[in-house]
Regions:
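Short acidic, S/G/P-rich loop/turn micro-motifs used as interaction or catalytic elements
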Residues: 39-44, 70-71, 99-106, 130-134, ...
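Glycine-rich, aromatic-bearing surface loops/beta-hairpins
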Residues: 137-186
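Extended, basic/helix-rich recognition subdomains
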Residues: 30-33, 37, 41-44, 48, ...
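Long, charge-dense
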Residues: 62-110
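N-terminal, charge-rich interaction modules
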Residues: 3-81
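Flexible, charged surface loops at secondary-structure boundaries
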Residues: 25-29, 115-121, 149
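Conserved P-loop NTPase "ATPase switch" module shared by AAA+ and STAND
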Residues: 119-135
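A short, acidic, amphipathic alpha-helical segment used as a generic capping/interface helix at domain edges
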Residues: 17, 105-117, 138
Length: 186
C-alpha cells in the first residue's frame, strides 16, 4: 500500500514542476504521461484524484476529466441513457456495445473534453479509464486528442500496464499499441 502512496506523492510533485508543465525532456514528443497502477489499488487512486482535484495549493491548474462520467454525459445529450438497459436486455450486451460504439466515438469525447482558452500551467488529468471500458479505449482517444491539446500536458491515470509501446488495461486484456506517451513514474 505504501508503494502506491509514494508513487502518487511523486505524481503530485511532478505535475507542478515547470519541466513537466512545459513538456521539457520529451525530445519534442507530445506531453502525454501515463500513471500505471495495479487495478486493486483503484480506491486509493480515486481518493488521490479527489484530493488533487480539491487541492487549492497546487502550482498548476488541474482539469480533471472522468471518462466514464463524460460517456454518461454524452449518452444523456443523445437522450439514450434510459433506453440502454432495455436495449441490452432485448438485444444482448454485444449488440448494445456495437450500437454505442457506432454512435459514440472519439469526436464526441473530444467535444466534451475540449476547452478554451488553454492557459500556461494547465494539466489535463484523464481518469475513469477502467470504468469506461469497453465503451472507449484510451489508446484511440489519446491519438485523437493530440491535435487539440498539443500545448497542455495530459496525465492518464491507468489501471494496468504501459511498457512504452503497448497499453494493457487491467494487466489482462490484449495489449494495444500506443507509443506516443511516457510512463510518468516507474
Amino acid at each position: 500500500m505504501s508503494d502506491i502512496k509514494e508513487r502518487l506523492d511523486k505524481v503530485r510533485a511532478l505535475i507542478q514542476e515547470p519541466e513537466f508543465l512545459e513538456g521539457k525532456g520529451l525530445s519534442n514528443e507530445v506531453n502525454i504521461r501515463i500513471f500505471c497502477y495495479e487495478p486493486e489499488n483503484e480506491m486509493v487512486v480515486r481518493h488521490f484524484e479527489n484530493q488533487l482535484e480539491t487541492d487549492q495549493f497546487l502550482d498548476c491548474h488541474l482539469i480533471v476529466c472522468n471518462l466514464y462520467k463524460t460517456f454518461l454525459s454524452i449518452c444523456d445529450d443523445m437522450d439514450i441513457t434510459d433506453a440502454i438497459p432495455d436495449m441490452e436486455e432485448a438485444d444482448g450486451s454485444a449488440y448494445l456495445l456495437e450500437q454505442l460504439n457506432s454512435a459514440i466515438g472519439n469526436g464526441e469525447f473530444i467535444d466534451k473534453i475540449q476547452y478554451e482558452p488553454h492557459e500556461p500551467g494547465d494539466v489535463l488529468m484523464l481518469t475513469g479509464v477502467g470504468e469506461v471500458f469497453p465503451f472507449m479505449r484510451i489508446h484511440t482517444l489519446l491519438e485523437a486528442l493530440q491535435p487539440y491539446f498539443s500545448d497542455v500536458p495530459i496525465l492518464v491515470m491507468y489501471p494496468g500496464e504501459f511498457d512504452g509501446r503497448h497499453v494493457k488495461l487491467f494487466n489482462r486484456l490484449t495489449p494495444n499499441d500506443y507509443y506516443r506517451a511516457f510512463n510518468v513514474i516507474d
